[in-house]
């Protein structure tokens, strides 16, 4: 073992306070070349956000069948229309593929907590059918840490509007680079992240073999997959 270590050892120098990673000499050389000609994502005019945290997915993430049931239980056409607008498609990390995603038939009950000075929080009293559904989970949603002003509301989210914009999304755990463009108003379930505003140019770079190689060297191994952390 001692001879093997002496033969295979490599010196790694960490000259800054930035995050560091142990690489072979040739890997260090490749990393330096990429970073010398590339522009860090933090210097692009973009934002990287985490997906939605509900605190209790069983209550707030529902199937197509449950969505239809909630809408059918609305007492007026006005309530039905407002309720339909509040229930939005949501993607999970496992649904996201390279340049695309799988329609999963899942929806988020977006009883958001509003944005101060911009959007008022959802008042559950205005959505009786949704309230009836959530009341079935009261013991769970009332105790959860991630909640808004009331147990019916989701936690504060300052970038709520950005979920309605085109965005680049990816799963938190991947075997390879799998970035997709989502152009509709779908939400993303945490811990999956998203980039806004979206760019086809950036999407192509992130899905390239070079970016895949680079991110793999910096990613965190978990469950034989890579937690892709970019920024």
Language-model features, listed with the residues they occupy:
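Polybasic, glycine- and aromatic-enriched phosphate-binding surface used to engage nucleic acids
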Residues: 3-231
């Amino acid at each position: 073992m001692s001879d093997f270590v002496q033969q295979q050892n490599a010196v790694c120098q960490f000259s800054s306070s930035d995050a560091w990673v142990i690489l072979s000499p040739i890997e260090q050389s490749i990393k330096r070349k990429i970073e010398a000609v590339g522009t860090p994502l933090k210097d692009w005019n973009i934002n990287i956000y985490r997906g939605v945290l509900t605190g209790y997915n069983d209550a707030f993430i529902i199937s197509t069948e449950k969505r239809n049931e909630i809408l059918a239980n609305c007492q007026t056409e006005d309530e039905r229309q407002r309720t339909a607008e509040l229930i939005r498609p949501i993607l999970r990390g496992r649904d996201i593929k390279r340049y695309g995603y799988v329609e999963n038939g899942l929806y988020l009950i977006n009883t958001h907590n509003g944005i101060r000075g911009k959007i008022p929080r959802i008042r559950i009293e205005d959505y009786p059918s949704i309230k009836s559904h959530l009341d079935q989970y009261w013991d769970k949603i009332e105790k959860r840490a991630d909640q808004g002003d009331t147990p019916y509301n989701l936690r504060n989210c300052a970038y709520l509007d950005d979920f309605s914009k085109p965005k680049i999304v990816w799963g938190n755990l991947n075997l390879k680079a799998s970035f997709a463009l989502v152009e509709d108003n779908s939400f993303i379930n945490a811990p999956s992240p998203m980039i806004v505003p979206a760019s086809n140019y950036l999407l192509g770079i992130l899905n390239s073999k070079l970016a895949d190689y680079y991110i793999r060297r910096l990613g965190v191994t978990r469950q034989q997959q890579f937690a892709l952390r970019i920024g």
